[in-house]
Amino acid sequence: MLPFLSMLVLLVQPLGNLGAEMKSLSQRSVPNTCTLVMCSPTENGLPGRDGRDGREGPRGEKGDPGLPGPMGLSGLQGPTGPVGPKGENGSAGEPGPKGERGLSGPPGLPGIPGPAGKEGPSGKQGNIGPQGKPGPKGEAGPKGEVGAPGMQGSTGAKGSTGPKGERGAPGVQGAPGNAGAAGPAGPAGPQGAPGSRGPPGLKGDRGVPGDRGIKGESGLPDSAALRQQMEALKGKLQRLEVAFSHYQKAALFPDGRSVGDKIFRTADSEKPFEDAQEMCKQAGGQLASPRSATENAAIQQLITAHNKAAFLSMTDVGTEGKFTYPTGEPLVYSNWAPGEPNNNGGAENCVEIFTNGQWNDKACGEQRLVICEF
């Protein structure tokens, strides 16, 4: 390396300096001159022998850094470092495919009851249920209003004479009694004014001859007036016989209530409307036809005692929605339940009365308690 650098130094020097040096060196008397003096380049001589290595020169300045060398081979993988802190959550990924249905879990605890719903509309009153078992005797309630007068009871045993009481209020007129035996003829009274001629009655059966009466005083010779009086008496007797016959037939029904001149009775039998109507007609009456709240209350007492609904006589067979009595008269009193009559199912043409006294339109083919009116 050193000889190469020496040649570079010599080549860099100017030729003039080189020649002067050579001249000065050539004038000196130095042994073995050939080894020290270089030939002039103009002389084209042979190259000299290699010189000795000179002393090492001073260390030069640090040169500029060279270009980076090629990347070396990867080193061996180092040991795994400690786990770093948890990073922030990444963005949600796309939903994966739906998995298979899992097994049913155990039933959950019952939820809290929701708020109470609105009150629904009133349902239609159902049929009367079977009579329940009698409950324990309750406490005595307040004294009720005076009820409708009951039927005349049978004559009781004669009691001992009590002290004279105060005069009571007039009682309800009782049913006409049986016709008594004919009494003796009384004295003839003064002749009254002639009355209007009544309609001739039906000829009655010939009666049993009575006892001969006491001879009366001589009356006025107006035979026409006497005949009129006799005809009037016959008419009254016939009406009494008809009324008595009705009471006899009504007595066949064991349970009843009396209101004014009406009697409502039942035999505790249940029939369809037409059969019930025929049953009352054969007994000389008709199905119950309440025309007032008092009569309706008397019928209610009967059906409450039997715990059954009963048919009334009114229908709307002639005109839908217009109920009439059997005579064709429109109603003068009614006590319909709320929302009635509604002709449910399009075939409710008869009327039934519930144990609460309210009315409902009902199919005539149903069976209901028979209550007759006399």
Curated annotation (Swiss-Prot):
<comment type="subunit">
    <text>Oligomeric complex of 4 set of homotrimers.</text>
</comment>
<dbReference type="Pfam" id="PF09006">
    <property type="entry name" value="Surfac_D-trimer"/>
</dbReference>
<dbReference type="GO" id="GO:0007585">
    <property type="term" value="P:respiratory gaseous exchange by respiratory system"/>
</dbReference>
<feature type="compositionally biased region" description="Basic and acidic residues">
    <location>
        <begin position="49"/>
        <end position="64"/>
    </location>
</feature>
<dbReference type="GO" id="GO:0030246">
    <property type="term" value="F:carbohydrate binding"/>
</dbReference>
<keyword id="KW-0176">Collagen</keyword>
<feature type="glycosylation site" description="N-linked (GlcNAc...) asparagine">
    <location>
        <position position="89"/>
    </location>
</feature>
<keyword id="KW-0399">Innate immunity</keyword>
<feature type="disulfide bond">
    <location>
        <begin position="350"/>
        <end position="364"/>
    </location>
</feature>
<keyword id="KW-0272">Extracellular matrix</keyword>
<feature type="coiled-coil region">
    <location>
        <begin position="222"/>
        <end position="253"/>
    </location>
</feature>
<feature type="modified residue" description="S-nitrosocysteine">
    <location>
        <position position="34"/>
    </location>
</feature>
<keyword id="KW-0430">Lectin</keyword>
<keyword id="KW-1015">Disulfide bond</keyword>
<dbReference type="Pfam" id="PF00059">
    <property type="entry name" value="Lectin_C"/>
</dbReference>
<feature type="compositionally biased region" description="Basic and acidic residues">
    <location>
        <begin position="203"/>
        <end position="215"/>
    </location>
</feature>
<feature type="region of interest" description="Disordered">
    <location>
        <begin position="38"/>
        <end position="222"/>
    </location>
</feature>
<dbReference type="GO" id="GO:0005576">
    <property type="term" value="C:extracellular region"/>
</dbReference>
<feature type="signal peptide">
    <location>
        <begin position="1"/>
        <end position="19"/>
    </location>
</feature>
<keyword id="KW-0702">S-nitrosylation</keyword>
<dbReference type="Pfam" id="PF01391">
    <property type="entry name" value="Collagen"/>
</dbReference>
<comment type="function">
    <text>Contributes to the lung's defense against inhaled microorganisms, organic antigens and toxins. Interacts with compounds such as bacterial lipopolysaccharides, oligosaccharides and fatty acids and modulates leukocyte action in immune response. May participate in the extracellular reorganization or turnover of pulmonary surfactant. Binds strongly maltose residues and to a lesser extent other alpha-glucosyl moieties.</text>
</comment>
<dbReference type="GO" id="GO:0042802">
    <property type="term" value="F:identical protein binding"/>
</dbReference>
<dbReference type="GO" id="GO:0005737">
    <property type="term" value="C:cytoplasm"/>
</dbReference>
<dbReference type="InterPro" id="IPR008160">
    <property type="entry name" value="Collagen"/>
</dbReference>
<keyword id="KW-0305">Gaseous exchange</keyword>
<keyword id="KW-0106">Calcium</keyword>
<feature type="compositionally biased region" description="Low complexity">
    <location>
        <begin position="137"/>
        <end position="149"/>
    </location>
</feature>
<dbReference type="InterPro" id="IPR001304">
    <property type="entry name" value="C-type_lectin-like"/>
</dbReference>
<dbReference type="InterPro" id="IPR015097">
    <property type="entry name" value="Surfac_D-trimer"/>
</dbReference>
<keyword id="KW-0175">Coiled coil</keyword>
<dbReference type="InterPro" id="IPR016187">
    <property type="entry name" value="CTDL_fold"/>
</dbReference>
<dbReference type="GO" id="GO:0062023">
    <property type="term" value="C:collagen-containing extracellular matrix"/>
</dbReference>
<feature type="compositionally biased region" description="Low complexity">
    <location>
        <begin position="70"/>
        <end position="79"/>
    </location>
</feature>
<keyword id="KW-0767">Surface film</keyword>
<dbReference type="GO" id="GO:0048286">
    <property type="term" value="P:lung alveolus development"/>
</dbReference>
<comment type="similarity">
    <text>Belongs to the SFTPD family.</text>
</comment>
<keyword id="KW-0677">Repeat</keyword>
<dbReference type="GO" id="GO:0045087">
    <property type="term" value="P:innate immune response"/>
</dbReference>
<protein>
    <recommendedName>
        <fullName>Pulmonary surfactant-associated protein D</fullName>
    </recommendedName>
</protein>
<dbReference type="InterPro" id="IPR051077">
    <property type="entry name" value="Ca-dependent_lectin"/>
</dbReference>
<keyword id="KW-0964">Secreted</keyword>
